[in-house]
Amino acid sequence: IFDRPVVPSGEAMGIYMKTDGVLVVDVCSFKNENGESCCPADGKVCTGDYIVSVDGMEISKRSELLDIVAESQGDSLSVRYIRDGEEKVCSITPEKNENGAYLLGAWVKDDVSGIGTVTFVDGTNFMALGHSVSDIDTGVMMRCSTGGVYTTDITNISKSYSSEPGRLQGLSLIHISEPTRLRRIS
């Protein structure tokens, strides 16, 4: 409970957040080097899982996962992931696609961005209360580690209806480095 004066707001803000691990958005087939459809990750990881390490190496970026898979040369990988808050481990053996690249058959992402509103400020802190941050592709509530808040220009407002929430659309200039970030989220 806050026992201090606050100033109500409602100002729009751009939000950028890094996921805690990499989010599995989908598990999908591809054609292997023999032209056959395959999906090494099928039945192992699924939409909404967070891959947090592979062969003992912590994963925080999509590029880290891609590099480990590429360097595997098709050897089985021990994948540690989180599903519904529970840590699990499985083995996945990457397969070579028609272009010679090793793949798992999992579409992943490591960040999310969007627009929100500042609820109130108290001089040094701000609060943005409301709904959780969810992935647009899966609807899964995001597990985030860090991020930032940025200025944004609203370009369109969609009115809400009884079965459809309203929506702000806008543009934010988001640089992961400091220059455009207003506040750090941690």
What are these regions (language model features)?
Residues G14-V45:
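PDZ/PDZ-like groove recognition
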Residues I174-I185:
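Residue-level detector of conserved catalytic or cofactor/ligand-binding positions
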Residues V24, A41, G48-I51, V79, ...:
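Terminal peptide-recognition signature
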Residues I1-L23, S63, S76:
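N-terminal targeting leaders that route proteins to membranes or the secretory/organellar pathways
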Residues G21, D42, R62-V69, I115:
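Extracytoplasmic/secreted envelope proteins and their assembly/folding machinery
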Residues E86-T151:
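C-terminal, low-ordered peptide segments at domain boundaries
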Residues F2-D3, M13, L66-A106:
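PDZ-domain C-terminal substructure recognizer with occasional recognition of PDZ-binding tails
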